Every structure is written in structure tokens, then in C-alpha cells.
UniProtKB/Swiss-Prot annotation:
Originating gene: ftsH1
Organism: Thermomicrobium roseum (strain ATCC 27502 / DSM 5159 / P-2)
Name by which UniProt lists this protein: ATP-dependent zinc metalloprotease FtsH 1
Gene Ontology annotations for the cellular component aspect, listed alphabetically: plasma membrane
Cytoplasmic side: 1-9, 132-652
GO MF entries: ATP binding; ATP hydrolysis activity; ATP-dependent peptidase activity; metalloendopeptidase activity; zinc ion binding
Cofactor binding, per record: Binds 1 zinc ion per subunit.
Active site, per annotation: 426
Composition bias type Pro residues, residue spans: 641-652
Record key words, sorted: ATP-binding, Cell membrane, Hydrolase, Membrane, Metal-binding, Metalloprotease, Nucleotide-binding, Plasmid, Protease, Transmembrane, Transmembrane helix, Zinc
Length: 652
């Protein structure tokens, strides 16, 4: 490809040089001749004694007439087949009276004279050839529309192995068998095992689906074809199906190999009913994929690995056994997974001795593998910005805030009242989160603007959580409302800074009622049905499957939950107004507080939730002490103890 480019550029430069030479020859040769003169004028000047000499060039019909006492030179062009001596005699001039000199023609002069006529012709021919080559390239591009755009990674490239993938141990075990099959297919054929046609990797963005598929190819040492689902379909009809055929033809020629289709939901969506009579190019591409995956020979060692974060919209024919035999789920890593991922991404990076990766993993719940990689990279950039040779705790923990909330905006100037209002707002969040047993502990509070936020309060669970209880949701609602309540109690008005808190609280309360069945009034029912439109994809619209009366009751339950959270937050802040002022004052002074600084303001320990159930279901840290436990108490469910410092509020 590069050689053709150099040839094409060289051809263009050659044409330009030839054109420049032609222009130069034309102007220079024309300039040397000077003004022209007729034969009558020359004869008159000779008779008048003005001409010093006549200069002739052999083989040329031009004569240079040089005048006495001046540098003027005029050019006479002889008629065809006319001799200068005969011409002078015709005008009655003796040739002996004139100094006539004859010079041999220069070889370069002949060449330049020839080029004067030849170069324009060569230039036109070159332009025509160049245009023909361009047209030929355009035709080739048009014919290559049906070719696959897959990128091929072979064994001579830097490989990714399972050692570079962490936090997805179960997925690696599932895919280890794929590696075994690609390496030793006869081992499975001897037992009559069927070749696995495809593996579907399902998981949220950033969980390592693409990385894991490349690790499979790296472990097996086979070619790896990578293509995105959106690269199949173009503006021309039939291009998608043609590219699918070409992709699988290449894969068969390079077997054993792996074909990786990223974001397969771009072409693998469930086929519709064909409403409107339109021809859906995407459906034809999907049909071709189904045919190709079902048309493999049993001896063809080609495995298709696809990745998607929307498995619910895929066509059932694509998911049946015989096409994608296995579905491997990749979820966000837990504490141990995050620790393993951090060890992989910090490999080869100079860390300071005080860096605790386990503590870092504990402070990043919900982070995906891509988030953790970005965190380590941001920390390295911060260290380089500060001209450090190593990455320390300060950079890593600051990188967490950058990933979660965005970079700091310390240059933004705000008034003292707005700064104080932000401090009380965030102090309200922190205080209510600290006093509620079922709320997550406060980790960090800051009034430094980050991203689009004027301040933020970070709470972290004590352990990984996969389920939420009603009490935890109610505590979270109270924490959401605490900022607004703090502004109202201190300043007797509320600001727009609580808009996002209100939106999140309303959304959570509505989901508690309509999705999670956490309403005592409406019971464990799910309200609202997802409308599956056949030609637009799934979950486009939500249809009400309940009456207006039920809709009114849903709104009332949402209002009741929000009001209850509001009253809970208000009671806590009223009972601990001194702590609210201390936290706000420290925030104005330091701008950022961690959980230990907030905990130091309290004399009593943080309230712990009282869990009901068999002791084996309770975390060790939350089991009641022998002084408070009653061995003879029954194990059936008991009413939960009231939240400390909160007066019971009647339901509205």
C-alpha cells in the first residue's frame, strides 16, 4: 500500500516538473530572441550602415541582427527554403559588406527545442493517465464494498493472555475450554463432543468482554478476526450480507481461528413483523449470520465470540443452541475482583510504599475493570503533572474523585453566602447518613466544585452489596432529602442545589412502589408494562396496565415515602443542630473532610442496624453482644427497633 502511494506521488511530481520545464523553455527561449524584424527593415538598416553583424545558427531559420553601438538584437525569421546570401543579393546588397557569422547548433538547444513541442503533449498524456488510474481506483473501491472490514490479529502481534484479565474467574474457566478445543480438537472429537459454534459475552460496558476474547485468542495462539456489528451495514443494499459471507470465508481459510463480533446487538436485534413493507437491510445481515453459523462443517475449527450489553433485544434464533451455545455473564467485580484488577493495572508502575491496593479496592465499589484502569491512569497522569517519580496515595485517591465526580474547579469564584449554603447542604447529607443505622457510612464530604456539581458527599458500603432492603432505601431517601432540609432550617429557604437530590429521591420512591413491591398500601405488585414494538426494538415505551385510581394511589405512596424521608431528615438535623454547624464550619475552613474527621465530632459510636433472622445470616460485626442478646428469645421475626433520635411520624 505504501509503495503504491509513493509511486502515485512520484508520478504527480514528475508531471509537475515536466510542466515547469516546458514553461521555462518557452519563456526563456522566447526572451532570448528579442524583437522581430522583417527582411525589408533588415535590408534598409544594412544599407544605412546600422547593422554590425548577422548571426546564424546551423539548422535554424532564425537570424540574429546585431546593431552598431547598441546591445539591441532583433530576430529575422527566413522564409522556407531561402538562403540569406541570395536574400541580400535580391535587395542589392553585397554579402561581403556584412559580417555574417554561422554558429553550430548546441546539443542542449536542440533538446530544449524538441522539449518545447514535446512537453505539452507529454503533460496532457500524463493527466489523462492519472485520471484513468483514479477512476480505476474508484471502481475498485465500489467493488470492495462487499468485502469484510474485519481486523486480523495474528500470532506475531503482542498477545493478551488470561494473566492480563482479572476479576472474572468464572468467565475465564468457561472460556478455558474454548482454548482447549482450539489447541487440542482431537481430544473432544474422540469423545464425540460437538464443536461449540459460538460464545456470547454478556455484561455492562467496561467489564472486559473485548479483552477476554483477545485473551482467548492469545492463549490459543490462533488468528483473531475483530469487527463491530455496526461495520456490516452500509448505505447499499446487500452489503451487510456480502460482508458476512466474506468474513466467514476468511475465517474458514485461516482455521482454526476466532471471529469476534463486538456490539452484536447492532445487527442481531429481534426481527420485526415487516410492517410498512420496507426492506430492512439489518435483517438480511442477521439472516446471513444465522445461515453462516449454522453452515459450519463439523471439522471447521472456527469459533464465534460475540459481545453485547443488551442481550434482551437479541433475536431468539441467534441465541439457540447450535449458534451461541454458551452465554458467559461478566458483571462488575466484587472486592476481591477489584483488588486483582488493580494489581494487573499497577503492574510495571512505580508505586509508593504506603499505597494499599486493598483499601483502594474497598473504596471503589461499583467500578468496572475499565473504570479501575482509568483510575490508575489518571493517578499516573497526576503524578507526572506534579513531577513525581512514583504514584502515591494522594494521586490514587484524588483519581477516584476525578473518575466519580470529574476534575476540580477551584478557579470558580462563588460568594460567601453560596459557599456557606453549599457547606450546610453537604453537612446535612453527611449528618443524616452518619445517624441512620441503615445508611452507608460517610467516606468524604467536599464543597469543592467538580464537574457539574457544586459539592458532593460520598458514602461507601462496608461490604459489597447485591441486594437492597426497604430500610436501606428509606435511609437513602432521607439522605437525599437532608441537603434540602438543612438549607430550609438554616436559611429559611431552599436553592436549586437540591434539584438532583429531589429527582433521585422521586425516582427511587416510585421504583419502590411500582417495581420492588415495597408499598404496604398497594402490596407486592409490579405496575407498568414495557411495550415491545416489533419494528423499533424492545423497551421503547411503557404502557399503563392499571387504572386511574391505582395511578392516584401510586402517586400518594410516592408522596408518603418522600414526606417520611423529609420528616426523618428534619428530626435528625433538629436533634443534632450543633453537629450540623460544626461540620459546616469545618467544610468552610478546610473545603474537604474525610469520614474520620466527621466521626471525631461524635462521642457515641455510629448506630448499627439491628438485623432480624438466624445468626448465620448476620455479618459478624453486626451480631448482638452477649449483654444485649437473649438466648431464649424466639427466632421468629420481631419488629425492628425505632431509629435513634427520631420521633415516630404519622403516615400522611
Amino acid at each position: 500500500m505504501s509503495d503504491n502511494k509513493w509511486l502515485r506521488n512520484g508520478f504527480v511530481w514528475m508531471i509537475l516538473i515536466i510542466a515547469a520545464i516546458a514553461v521555462w523553455v518557452t519563456f526563456v527561449q522566447g526572451g532570448r530572441g528579442g524583437a522581430t524584424i522583417t527582411t525589408q527593415e533588415m535590408a534598409a538598416d544594412i544599407k544605412a550602415g546600422k547593422v554590425e553583424r548577422l548571426v546564424m545558427t546551423s539548422g535554424s531559420d532564425e537570424i540574429q541582427v546585431q546593431y552598431i553601438g547598441t546591445n539591441e538584437v532583433r530576430t529575422l525569421r527566413l522564409p522556407p527554403n531561402v538562403d540569406i546570401f541570395e536574400l541580400l543579393k535580391t535587395f542589392g546588397i553585397d554579402p561581403q559588406q556584412v559580417d555574417i557569422q554561422t554558429h553550430r547548433a548546441s546539443q542542449w538547444g536542440n533538446v530544449l527545442g524538441t522539449l518545447t513541442f514535446l512537453l505539452p503533449t507529454l503533460f496532457l498524456i500524463g493527466v489523462i493517465i492519472f485520471m484513468m488510474r483514479q477512476a480505476q481506483g474508484t471502481n475498485n473501491q465500489a467493488l470492495s464494498f462487499g468485502k469484510s472490514r474485519a481486523r486480523v490479529f495474528t500470532s506475531n502481534r503482542p498477545t493478551v493472555t488470561f494473566d492480563d484479565v482479572a476479576g472474572v474467574d468464572e468467565a475465564k474457566e468457561e472460556l478455558q475450554e474454548i482454548v482447549e478445543f482450539l489447541k487440542y480438537p482431537e481430544k473432544f472429537a474422540a469423545l464425540g463432543a460437538r464443536i461449540p459454534r459460538g460464545v456470547l459475552l454478556v455484561g455492562p460496558p467496561g467489564t472486559g468482554k473485548t479483552l477476554l476474547s483477545r485473551a482467548v485468542a492469545g492463549e490459543a495462539g490462533v488468528p483473531f478476526f475483530s469487527i463491530s456489528g455496526s461495520e456490516f451495514v452500509e448505505m447499499f443494499v446487500g452489503v451487510g450480507a456480502s460482508r458476512v459471507r466474506d468474513l466467514f470465508d476468511q475465517a474458514k481459510r485461516n482455521a482454526p481461528c476466532i471471529v469476534f463480533i463486538d456490539e452484536i446487538d447492532a445487527v442481531g436485534r429481534q426481527r420485526g413483523a415487516g410492517l410498512g413493507g420496507s426492506h430492512d437491510e439489518r435483517e438480511q445481515t442477521l439472516n446471513q449470520i444465522l445461515v453462516e453459523m449454522d453452515g459450519f462443517d463439523s471439522s471447521t475449527n472456527v469459533i464465534v465470540i460475540a459481545a453485547t450489553n443488551r442481550p434482551d433485544v437479541l433475536d431468539p434464533a441467534l441465541l439457540r443452541p447450535g449458534r451461541f451455545d454458551r452465554q458467559v455473564v461478566l458483571d462488575r467485580p466484587d472486592l476481591h475482583g477489584r483488588l486483582a484488577i488493580l494489581k494487573v493495572h499497577t503492574r510495571g508502575k512505580p508505586l509508593e510504599s504506603d499505597v494499599d491496593l486493598e483499601d483502594l479496592a474497598r473504596q471503589t465499589p461499583g467500578f468496572s475493570g475499565a473504570d479501575l484502569e482509568n483510575l490508575v491512569n489518571e493517578a499516573a497522569i497526576l503524578a507526572a503533572r506534579r513531577n513525581k517519580k512514583t504514584i502515591g496515595r494522594r494521586e490514587l485517591y484524588e483519581a477516584i474523585d476525578r473518575v466519580v465526580a470529574g476534575p476540580e474547579r477551584k478557579s470558580r469564584r462563588i460568594s460567601e453566602r453560596e459557599k456557606l449554603m453549599t457547606a450546610y447542604h453537604e453537612a446535612g447529607h453527611a449528618l443524616v447518613a452518619r445517624m441512620l443505622p441503615h445508611a452507608d457510612p460517610v467516606h468524604k464530604v467536599s464543597i469543592v466544585a467538580r464537574g457539574m456539581m457544586g459539592g458532593y458527599t460520598r458514602v461507601l458500603p462496608e461490604e459489597d452489596r447485591f441486594f437492597w432492603t426497604k430500610k436501606q432505601f428509606e435511609a437513602q431517601l432521607a439522605v437525599f432529602m437532608a441537603g434540602l432540609v438543612a438549607e430550609e432550617l438554616v436559611f429559611q429557604e431552599v436553592s436549586t442545589g437540591a434539584a438532583n437530590d429531589i429527582e433521585r429521591a422521586t425516582t427511587l420512591a416510585r421504583r419502590m412502589v411500582t417495581e420492588f413491591g415495597m408499598s404496604e398500601r398497594l402490596g407486592p405488585l409490579a405496575f407498568g408494562r414495557k411495550e415491545e414494538l416489533v419494528f423499533l426494538g424492545r423497551e421503547i415505551a411503557e404502557q399503563r396496565n392499571y387504572s386511574d385510581q391505582v395511578a392516584y394511589e401510586i402517586d400518594q405512596e410516592v408522596r408518603r415515602l418522600i414526606d417520611q424521608a423529609y420528616q426523618t431528615a428534619k428530626q435528625i438535623l433538629l436533634d443534632h443542630m450543633d453537629k450540623l454547624e460544626k461540620i459546616a464550619t469545618l467544610l468552610v475552613e478546610k473545603e474537604t473532610l474525610d469520614g474520620h474527621e466527621i466521626e471525631a465530632l461524635f462521642d457515641e459510636p455510629r448506630p448499627r442496624p439491628e438485623l432480624v433472622g438466624p445468626p448465620l445470616t448476620r455479618p459478624a460485626a453486626l451480631i448482638a453482644t452477649p449483654e444485649t442478646a437473649r438466648p431464649d428469645s424466639p427466632s421468629e421475626a420481631r419488629p425492628a427497633a425505632p431509629v435513634p433520635h427520631i420521633k415516630p411520624q404519622p403516615a400522611s
